[in-house]
Amino acid sequence: LRQDPDIIVIGEIRDEESLDIALKASLTGHLVFSTLHTNDAISAITRMLDMKAKDYLIASALSLVIAQRLVRKLCEHCKRKSAKHYNEFEGDFYEAVGCELCKMNGYFGREMVSEFLFIDEEIAELIRTNAKTSEILSYARKKGFKTMFEVGLQRAREGKTSIDELLRVIK
């Protein structure tokens, strides 16, 4: 029985063989989704190189890398403006308090903070030429890339999560 799927989902890429299959499937016209354990989107490229993938295959096969984390959401009923001043961050922030609704936790539910690294021709060329992670990040920032921490900081400014929670999860 021959199969020719348009979309391939690989649960997790853990070894060189799985990575090679995923990259080659992508190059032959398949849309491939998978997971890879890294701290951020740009580190996924480094991880693939560490797994012996060829730079030109990565550059040609990748379209998008997403990194994400879940942060606890502040309870809407009991959160309060924080009296703490975070010298390195501008803005007003909120903190967890605790009430019956959130079972005295101060948090209720979770929210995703993520970063999206779109692989355009320039980033593909940076990958092919073994550019440093910092060079890729610098270029991506010029194109509007926001790190998970920056996205999380915005969520904290909006009162959706706390700085303490953000630092616990991301830093």
PLM regions with names:
Residues 1-171:
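Short, flexible helix-loop junctions that flank or precede catalytic/ligand sites
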